[in-house]
């Protein structure tokens, strides 16, 4: 397979879409593609004159914004290696990642700038403020001079105009060249630096072009909700759309469901990329209350009326997401079965994909028209997927993936790399699943999360949690093991409890009723013996999956 230059795709998009809108900070300023090119060129001049060379590491840590995107593009198209860091990480984690990655420069957002301690990152030559690219810290005279005289140097290099023909970016030498190092939060509680090669960025962009290229056109609007420092948001809310010539809107502050819903209504995106939590919250808050009255339930069960009612409900759900999208692509964590069953029953245009940072990220996908509910699609373009099981259709086994999207390995961690990528090039995901005869993959849980029943039965806590989360007043839950008993930690929906004027005793009674109902829905060996109320929301990773390693029954 011949893999073209990824940076050539970036360069071509900038030139082809020169006078079109490119990046907008929601309710703020807009950069056109030529503005992006000009900003990239200025950063290249600063890099060159401050001593940054090809292969140097440049870290970025801040909320999504147009300037974050520009700094990332400038890094790759200069030939440096990008190190995106999630802004939600604690300061010590940021320090550790900067140091471990050998970063030379660090771009920081406004909040991160006030939290980090430069003295704990001795290898850095400078810290640059993302909102205006000013210097927060400079440890070399070259960097100080380059930033102070940047406009002057740009004017000398381009005395009249900066034109399309001046755009001349670094082209990677081969597809295996390292493009970026992406540090995962990881379910084990420590970060690993995933080395993402250019071929993986291209593989994901080419996959997106294959499945969405005819549905999305230059100038279409896209909303960036997921953090760009996470591969899911990076690949499918930024890179593909930028290459396509779309107009990307950044929600620069922590987006609540209300803000997201408002943005959907105003921007009307052409495709929506999301994690289950966002979809579930919007459905539960904006849609379920309207359809859970007795009259609506009765109409839904009358065959003649049911179809029209479902069409009307589908329109309502679609309008909650802007009403202009080809499909909603959901990934990043397990999708609640109650919400998924509802969306499927009313004909909502959604699909669920599957991926991992180590595959930058896509592994499985299927268009909504052919999507099998409960699955996460089939092996994506350029990828192979198999289940490590003697009977992949019926007995869950580890999901393995192979193809150009797979990482080079973990930075400075050969042992972890060998444990994750075998000698035949298969990436071992750590997830358990089955595959039907048509190639649809069904995730059964993470192998690390698997619990053992009293008689050695495999118990997948996610399956129990999925049912429990659909019961009364349950916002979220974690199932843990104590000896041979299973205990469910439940964070209640306190807003709903308050609406119903329920006190602590009544809430406890509801949870006991939930436990009894839950146990009628699951095998005897996985019955829950106790529900404990957990007052605070569970801590989550940036992709909104619960950090279950933090919670025990003790």
Predicted regions: what they are:
Residues 248-251, 328, 335-397, 405-408, ...:
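Conserved ATP-binding loop and adjacent catalytic segment of the adenylate-forming AMP-binding
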Residues 476, 484, 515-554:
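Conserved C-terminal "lid"/linker of ANL adenylate-forming enzymes
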Residues 393-394, 398-453, 470:
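Conserved ATP-binding/catalytic segment of the ANL
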Residues 9, 50, 77-157, 484:
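Structural core segment of the AMP-binding/adenylate-forming
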Residues 202-221, 231-315, 324, 349:
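Conserved AMP-binding/adenylation subdomain of ANL enzymes
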Residues 2, 29-30, 45-89, 225:
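Conserved AMP-binding/adenylate-forming
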Residues 18-19, 147-183, 190, 215-221:
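Conserved pre-ATP/AMP-binding loop-to-beta segment of ANL
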Residues 32-34, 170, 179-205:
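Conserved AMP-binding A3 loop
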């Amino acid at each position: 397979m011949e893999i073209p230059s990824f940076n050539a795709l970036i360069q071509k998009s900038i030139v082809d879409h020169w006078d079109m809108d490119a990046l907008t900070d929601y309710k703020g300023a807009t950069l056109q593609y030529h503005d992006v090119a000009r900003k990239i060129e200025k950063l290249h001049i600063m890099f060159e004159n401050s001593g940054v060379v090809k292969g140097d590491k440049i870290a970025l840590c801040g909320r999504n914004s147009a300037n974050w995107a520009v700094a990332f593009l400038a890094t790759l198209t200069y030939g440096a290696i990008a190190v995106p860091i999630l802004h939600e990480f604690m300061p010590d984690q940021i320090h550790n990642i900067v140091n471990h990655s050998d970063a030379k420069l660090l771009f920081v957002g406004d909040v991160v700038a006030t939290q980090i301690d430069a003295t704990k990152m001795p290898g850095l030559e400078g810290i640059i403020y993302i909102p205006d690219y000013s210097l927060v810290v400079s440890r070399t005279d070259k960097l100080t001079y380059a930033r102070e005289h940047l406009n002057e140097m740009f004017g000398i290099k381009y005395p009249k105009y900066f034109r399309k023909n001046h755009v001349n970016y670094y082209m990677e030498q081969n597809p295996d060249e390292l493009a970026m190092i992406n540090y995962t939060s990881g379910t084990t509680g420590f970060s690993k630096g995933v080395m993402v090669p250019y071929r993986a960025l291209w593989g994901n962009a080419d996959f997106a072009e294959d499945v969405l290229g005819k549905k999305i056109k230059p100038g279409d609007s896209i909303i960036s909700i997921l953090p760009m420092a996470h591969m899911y948001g990076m690949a499918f809310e930024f890179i593909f759309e930028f290459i396509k010539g779309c107009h990307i809107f950044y929600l620069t502050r922590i987006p609540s469901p209300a803000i997201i819903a408002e943005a959907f209504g105003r921007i009307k995106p052409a495709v929506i990329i999301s994690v289950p939590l966002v979809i579930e919250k919007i459905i539960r808050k904006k849609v379920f209350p309207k359809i859970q009255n007795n009259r609506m339930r009765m109409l839904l069960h009358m065959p003649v009326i049911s179809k029209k009612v479902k069409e009307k409900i589908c329109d309502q759900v679609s309008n909650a997401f802007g009403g202009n999208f080809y499909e909603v692509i959901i990934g990043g964590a397990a999708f609640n079965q109650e919400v998924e069953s509802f969306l499927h029953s009313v004909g909502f245009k959604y699909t669920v994909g599957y991926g991992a940072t180590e595959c930058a990220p896509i592994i499985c996908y299927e268009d909504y028209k052919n999507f099998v509910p409960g699955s996460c699609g089939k092996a994506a373009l350029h990828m192979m997927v198999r289940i490590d099981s003697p009977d992949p259709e019926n007995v869950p086994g580890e999901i393995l993936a192979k193809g150009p999207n797979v990482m080079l390995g973990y930075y400075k961690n050969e042992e972890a790399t060998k444990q994750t990528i075998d000698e035949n090039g298969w990436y071992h995901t750590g997830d358990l699943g089955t595959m039907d005869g048509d190639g649809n993959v069904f995730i059964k849980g993470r192998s690390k999360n698997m619990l053992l029943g009293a008689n050695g039965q495999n118990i997948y806590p996610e399956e129990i949690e999925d049912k429990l989360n659909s019961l009364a007043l349950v916002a979220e839950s974690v199932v843990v093991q104590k000896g041979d008993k299973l205990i469910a930690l439940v964070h209640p929906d306190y807003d709903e409890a308050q609406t119903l004027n329920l006190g602590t005793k009544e809430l406890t009674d509801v949870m006991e009723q939930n436990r009894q109902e839950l146990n009628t829905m699951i095998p005897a060996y996985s019955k829950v013996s106790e529900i404990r109320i957990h007052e605070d929301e569970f801590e989550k990773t940036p992709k909104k999956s619960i950090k279950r390693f933090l919670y025990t029954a003790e």
